[in-house]
Every structure is written in structure tokens, then in C-alpha cells.
Amino acid sequence: MFHTIIIVGNVGRDPEMRYTPSGQAVTSFSVATNRQYTNNNGETIKETIWFRVSAWGKQAEICNQYLKKGSKVLVEGRLTPDKETGGPRIWNGQDGTARASYEITAQTVRFLTSRAEAESGAPAADETAAPADEADIPF
């Protein structure tokens, strides 16, 4: 059996790298994904889902070096279930409401924010470009 998850979002805080007792690098960071839709009442609903990502080995070192809060990334990997529940990790937020944390072990991390954008704080190119007209698509 095989499963994979692909997300695109923004890094929520600067990555943290550490080493296992055997010397293998592991970097952890959070990624927020956003979705907007209109419900049956005509209200616009904005939904954010947070993922905790772990990258290992050389990829961990590269993520730690180049990612920072706000960087746009694509993460491909596998969901890592909570050992106790077999699903997402459930916890209570500061306001007392139940929250879920989805954890991904990364196989691929792609940086979608260019180095120049990261240094200047400018938005990613796809955030400023006009939407493509379907007639302009070359296939």
C-alpha cells in the first residue's frame, strides 16, 4: 500500500533543526494552507489548516538554511498518524476548543519563494500575476 499527501502553503515560523543521537539531521516547521469558499448561505468562508512537517537528512539541512517564516513551499510526503489515536494529534487551544494537528514526514520540499523575494519580503510571483484566461492556455 502507498499513500502520499501534497500541500502548498506558507511556513508559519522559522524552522528548527536538531540531530538524532545517531547524528542524522531533522528539521521541523509548520505550514499553513488556506482555502476560501462560499457556503450555502452565500457567506465567504476562509479556512486555514496547519501541518507540522519533518524533513530528514540533507533535505533537513537545506530547509533549515533557506526556509523562514512566510516562505511559500510545496511539501510532498506521508501523513504520520498519532501513535495513540491513529489519526491527527488532538489538543486543546488556549481558548479551550479542540484542535487537530496533522503531521507530515516530508519526502520532497520545494521552495516556491525565490531568494530575491525572500530577502525583500515581496509577494511570490503567482500572488501578483493576473489570472490566466482559459483561451491563453497552450493545450
Residue ranges, per PLM feature:
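Core FKBP-type peptidyl-prolyl cis-trans isomerase
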Residues: 4-47, 83-88, 100
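Small beta-barrel nucleic-acid-binding modules, principally OB-folds
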Residues: 29, 36-73
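Beta-rich strand-turn-strand
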Residues: 56-90, 97-98, 113-115
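Acidic, gly/ser/pro-rich intrinsically disordered tails
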Residues: 1-2, 18-23, 39-42, 95-97, ...
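OB-fold and OB-like beta-barrel modules that bind single-stranded nucleic acids
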Residues: 5-13, 31, 69-81, 106-109
